[in-house]
Amino acid sequence: MKVLIVEDDGDMRRLLKIVLAGMDVETEEAPDGESAIHSLETSSDPDLVLLDLHLPYTSGEEVFEAIRKHSKSAIVIVTADILAAPEFVSKADGVFTKPFKTNELIIKLTSLLAAHKKDMQGEQ
């Protein structure tokens, strides 16, 4: 399983990577929206994208739309401002408000990754 972490805050990216390390998943990081879209265009699709909405260069909203248009990846929004883009929050597969409880994030991500894996196997 592969997870793309799209987060401009380096400390938050490291924390998310540490959380995911215990879940036996491959991670890729993008510090901004432009890097995230480049990664989506040049790498195999991630199973899950952890997406901050407030990003430099290309907004999280634009990244969200690009993912939905070109990928079947699950999207979990991780943001400090839940009210910033309610239309995207309602379309996401999950939402976590910073700061979040690590154990709750692990439970949700485990569930989403299992469901995504099952969906992908059903399509084969």
State each model region's role.
Residues 29-48:
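Acidic, metal-coordinating helix/loop segments flanking the phosphotransfer/catalytic sites
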Residues 52:
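Active-site residues of response regulator receiver
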Residues 100-113, 117:
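C-terminal output helix
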Residues 10-28:
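Two-component/phosphorelay signaling modules centered on CheY-like receiver
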Residues 61-72:
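Short amphipathic alpha-helix used as the core "switch/output" element in two-component signaling
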Residues 7, 79:
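Conserved acidic carboxylate
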